[in-house]
Amino acid sequence: MQETNRTEISTVGEFGLIKRLTENIQLQNPESLYGVGDDAAVLDFGSQQTLVTTDLLMEGVHFDLVYTPLKHLGYKSAIVNFSDIYAMNGTPKQITVSLAVSKRFCIEDLEQFYEGLQLACQLHGVDIVGGDTTSSVTGLAISITCLGVANKDQVVYRNGAKETDLICVSGDLGAAYMGLQLLEREKAVFEGEQEINPDFTGKEYLLERQLKPEARKDIIDALHQEGIRPTSMMDISDGLSSELMHICTQSHTGCRIYEERIPIDYQTAVMAEELNMNVTTCALNGGEDYELLFTVPLSEHEKVASMKGVKVIGHITKPELGCALITRDGQEFELKAQGWNPLREK
């Protein structure tokens, strides 16, 4: 390869790379309604639109098999794809599964992976309809493509937020990141002392959020029951701050969120204190929560405020006001996209 005009991938990050590679792509087929730039592509085949999303998971980058059971990995691999479809206000229907496997894996290992994969599919009513397998010299690689459907007038994009809209999140944030920190800590201890027995007592919730996340179909169902169509929506995979800035950038808006309104579980707060970490920072930037971040018109306040598992954390503003966090003592800090980035230089 020529060394002239060489730009390191780490200087632009994951989303910068995607933009660079796809900014000149033009859709050629009328059925291709929306391509790169959201949680899933949208294909129009009549009264319903088809949603398509793909995730690639690499051993050593996205997961560590020292502490990740293969059954859990199979479950999580499916769930992260379903979450993207739900984030478009759609319903996942089918997946294809492709694996690159090194010689250290046996058939029984892959059966464990598929056991978790099938469990997730059964719970969400999704069919496994194809895929591919090949060999690998660098460990395990997983590529899953998920197809879903949504009615034409129900698809929700990232770019629809409007000034005065309420910013809402489901569940609680930061727990998955704390679970990862706990597992990494115990791994470091284990590697230094073979006789150690990890103690996870009282931290089971954090481990579950990291190893076995859930896609929030229940929230999508609740929104439908209330007759609410969000103006914008994403799932929180890279961190609240990063995802919120994606919504504001694509919607050409600003935002204000309030620290005291960010939902944080008790175990998350305890673990953050134990690790001498700021729990709000963990909630903003931790990632892998797979909760839903969405905006709704101010007129829907009463409905969303009464929804179980949903918290209103702020509002959308004019773009010139930027994106900011209001702390408990009233100070205003600029939000920065410091969430997880697989292409960042170590």
Region locations from a protein language model:
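Glycine-rich anion-binding loops of enzyme active sites
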Residues: 57, 93-186, 315
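Glycine-rich anion/phosphate-binding loops
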Residues: 34, 66-80, 104-115, 153
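Glycine-/charge-enriched secondary-structure boundary and capping motifs
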Residues: 2-16, 20-26, 104-127, 137-142, ...
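Short, compositionally biased
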Residues: 179-200
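Small-aliphatic-rich amphipathic alpha-helix that forms the alpha element of a beta-alpha
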Residues: 70-94, 115-123, 222, 242-247
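Polyanion-binding loop/helix "lid" in catalytic or ligand-binding cores
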Residues: 197-244
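Residue-level signal for inorganic ion chemistry
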Residues: 42, 81, 89, 128, ...
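Extreme N-terminal cap/leader segments of soluble proteins
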Residues: 1-69, 88, 97, 345-346
